[in-house]
């Protein structure tokens, strides 16, 4: 049995759906009339249109992304059973997408470090040295970050030896 509160919620949902459909139809017709108004041109790629909300290639040397790399690798290390921490060697490729926060897809060259996970100290991956005799790897990662919530989720999409 529906209560008045349930009925009110249902009416709001229906109204929201109708408004969303009307706006979607308006956006489709606006895009059909003038597709260039639906594109954004930013940064170095000003001659190439970028789809709003779509994946955008980023510069692997971008300071904002490089500052995130140690935190990202710490999350990767939490998921690994290896005795040693992995450390970043080089960010090879990165793209981003604005969602509720920012999603990054990246290829990161990593190596096993001399820093052991068993130590109780907080590890600074930028100060760890590479453990010789172990192959470097390229990890493909997807990172979802919402800094205002202090939230970061890292998913390992793939790993291959260099």
Swiss-Prot record:
GO cellular-component term (any): cytoplasm
Ranges for the region named Disordered are: 30-54
User: Which ranges are annotated Basic and acidic residues under compositional bias?
Assistant: 36-47
Superkingdom, according to UniProt? Eukaryota
Tissue pattern of expression reads: Expressed in the cuticle of L3 and L4 larvae, female adult, and in the eggshell of developing microfilariae.
Signal peptide span = 1-32
Cysteine disulfide links:
115-128
Q: Name one GO molecular function term.
A: cysteine-type endopeptidase inhibitor activity
- Lineage of the source organism? Eukaryota, Metazoa, Ecdysozoa, Nematoda, Chromadorea
State the name under which the record lists this protein. Onchocystatin
Pfam families to which the protein is assigned, alphabetical: Cystatin
Alphabetically sorted, this entry's keywords are: Disulfide bond, Protease inhibitor, Signal, Thiol protease inhibitor
Q: What does this protein do?
A: Cysteine protease inhibitor which inhibits members of the peptidase C1 family. In the human host, inhibits CTSL/cathepsin L and CTSS/cathepsin S and to a lesser extent CTSB/cathepsin B which may cause defects in antigen processing and thereby impair antigen-driven T cell proliferation.
